[in-house]
Regions:
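Short His-centered aromatic/hydrophobic patch
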Residues: 95-101, 119
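Short, structured helix-loop element that forms part of the nucleotide-activated donor/catalytic region
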Residues: 46-49, 232-261, 349
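Acidic anion/phosphate-binding donor-loop and adjacent secondary structure
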Residues: 127-128, 155-159, 172-192
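Aromatic "clamp/platform" in nucleotide-sugar-dependent glycosyltransferases that forms part
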Residues: 268, 287
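N-terminal strand-loop element at the rim of the active site
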Residues: 7-15, 19-23, 27-69, 153-158, ...
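Short hydrophobic beta-strand element within catalytic cores of glycosyltransferases
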Residues: 304-308
Length: 384
């Protein structure tokens, strides 16, 4: 009999958690499972294509009367999800990110369905509201397995939430990187903004400007742009529409009034590998991470990378001075500017660091991490 697995996440918008959700679903589907990805939000928010063989279901929207209750309607939403699970009777459920995991664990309570939780950020630096923290403390011990991306995250979850057992599963790099639309050619797009082929380009990628430290990046670029008027900063992932009420593009433009012609926002793209290959340097000045997909992908693409040594993940990818540069998490804009200037002026050094970075293709290969994940699933459901 075909086993059924449900992966539950808020949406399939741009982001590392969403990509990993679809990757796990594909692995399970290719292993013979009937894999279903359930999201709270509909296809209008989708960015990533659903893999062949994976089902996609959107939770029924709340009736008008339930929407009137706002957060107070959460228990009813849990009961509706529980009823859906009773009807479909999956053999395994996986909750991706904190809030969907909490809701899924509550909905599964007492149904006898094995559950996996995948925390996607470093919990003490991305604190949910108090009610969610209390519910997380209550529910996380119920899960039969916790996927953790770093040892530090695993230690915190075990110490503070009694989240055991755990499987250490870093993000894999799928090489070559998947391609999908929109896929603007970086050279053509930049040329339309008067960026010449010989002009140097700094690249950053992310959808959450504060977490990714793009304000830090702007402060550093302000120093560099004064010295190098032909240097350009490209930030992928930020959209022109507000994010949680904040126009992130406009916010960054205001930080760089003298360099507005050197700051570029292509938005979301599905051919990010092409942009890594066009860039002279990839920069990740994040305040915190779970495990930085974009840094992993940039290194796999042979791009010379500079990252903050933030919690958690960059230090597990970069060996400073060997396969990239690792900056102190509290490094000043001037310190960043000095390191970036040195690398821009030394193509031989950039090439050496970029070549060494390619080892992530093997260290974090899909083959290795797929075997690890499927082994954990087999042990959980008793297939050993």
């Amino acid at each position: 009999m075909t086993r059924r697995v449900v992966l539950y996440i808020d949406s399939l918008k741009t982001g590392g958690a969403e990509r990993v959700t679809l990757l796990l679903a594909r692995w399970l589907s290719e292993d013979g499972w009937l894999a279903t990805v359930v999201t709270r939000h509909g296809a209008s928010r989708d960015f990533y294509p659903v893999p062949a063989g994976v089902q996609r279901i959107v939770e029924p929207s709340d009736p008008v009367w339930l929407r009137l209750f706002g957060p107070l309607g959460f228990p009813v939403r849990v009961r509706r999800l529980r009823a859906w699970l009773r009807r479909h009777q999956p053999d395994l459920v996986i909750g991706m990110t904190t809030l969907p995991a909490i809701k899924l664990l509550l909905a599964c309570r007492g149904l006898g369905i094995p559950s996996i939780v995948s925390e996607r950020n470093f919990p003490p630096l991305k604190r949910p509201g108090l009610p969610w923290r209390l519910l997380r403390r209550l529910t996380y011990p119920w899960a039969q397995l916790h996927l953790v991306q770093t040892q530090a995250t695993g230690r915190w979850l075990a110490q503070h939430l009694k989240a055991q057992p755990q499987l250490l599963l870093a993000n894999p790099v799928v090489w070559p990187l998947p391609r999908f639309s929109p896929d603007p050619d970086p050279n053509d797009w930049l040329a339309s903004r008067h960026v010449r082929p010989q002009d140097q380009v700094l690249l950053a990628v992310g959808t959450k400007a504060h977490q990714k430290g793009f304000d830090r990046l702007a402060a550093m670029f302000e120093l560099l742009s004064q010295r190098s008027p032909q240097l350009h900063l490209v930030i992928l992932g930020l959209e022109s529409v507000p994010y949680h009420g904040v126009d992130q593009q406009d916010q960054l433009r205001r930080l760089l009034p003298q360099a507005s012609q050197q700051l570029h926002f292509p938005g979301r793209v599905g051919n990010v590998q092409d942009w890594y290959e066009r860039a002279d340097l990839f920069l990740l000045p994040s305040r915190y991470e779970g495990f930085p997909n974009v840094l992993l992908e940039a290194m796999a693409s042979g791009c010379c990378c500079v990252s903050s040594d933030c919690p958690q993940g960059p230090a597990e990818l970069i060996r400073d001075g060997v396969n990239g540069r690792l900056m102190a998490n509290d490094a000043s804009p001037a310190e960043w500017a000095d390191v970036v200037s040195t690398l821009l002026a030394d193509p031989e050094l950039r090439g050496r660091l970029a070549d060494a970075a390619l080892d992530v293709r093997d260290r974090f290969s899909e083959r290795r991490l797929r075997r690890c994940f499927m082994g954990g699933v087999s042990q959980l459901i008793g297939d050993d």
